[in-house]
Curated annotation (Swiss-Prot):
Tissues and organs where the protein is expressed, per its UniProt entry: Expressed in conidia and aerial hyphae.
Signal sequence coordinates: 1-18
Major location category of this protein: secreted
Residue pairs linked by disulfide bridges in the UniProt entry: C52-C101, C60-C94, C61-C79, C102-C116
Quaternary context: Self-assembles to form functional amyloid fibrils called rodlets. Self-assembly into fibrillar rodlets occurs spontaneously at hydrophobic:hydrophilic interfaces and the rodlets further associate laterally to form amphipathic monolayers.
Induction description: Expression is increased during sporulation. Expression up-regulated by carbon or nitrogen starvation.
Keywords: Cell wall, Disulfide bond, Glycoprotein, Secreted, Signal
Protein family membership: Belongs to the fungal hydrophobin family.
Annotated glycan sites: N83
Species this protein is from: Passalora fulva
Stated name of the protein: Class I hydrophobin 2
Length: 121
């Protein structure tokens, strides 16, 4: 019974945070990019549309979880948090639109990326 309650609470939290409206806490909304110049690049060298807000990082998933349900962002795919060396190796390209903005503040507890938001490059 407790396991079901925990899973349902986690699923509700993912449903609320994984699919925000046009503007989000991670800065991937269209309104955020209106004030930047056309040659704006993030710290990782990605293009203007691939920047994440302060406190979040670009993650690249190596397996496709786009067709999965709400828990696909938590359980599906194998995502790597972006580093400068990873982006230079991948040349800012992730397979099959599997790019996400994930929070970068890890507090040592169960660190699943439940709040990762898909972004288009």
């Amino acid at each position: 019974m407790q396991f079901t309650t925990i899973v349902m609470t986690l699923a509700a939290a993912v449903a609320v945070t994984a699919y925000p409206g046009s503007s989000s806490a991670f800065g991937v909304g269209q309104d955020e990019h209106k004030h930047h110049s056309s040659d704006d690049h993030s710290a990782t060298g990605a293009s203007k549309g691939a920047t994440c807000a302060v406190g979040s990082q670009v993650s690249c998933c190596t397996t496709d979880s786009s067709g999965s349900d709400v828990l696909g962002n938590v359980l599906g795919g194998s995502c790597l948090v972006d580093n400068l060396s990873l982006i230079s190796i991948l040349n800012s390209q992730c397979p099959g639109a599997n790019t996400f903005c994930c929070p970068s503040n890890q507090d040592g507890t169960l660190n699943i990326h439940a709040a990762c938001i898909p972004v288009a490059l």
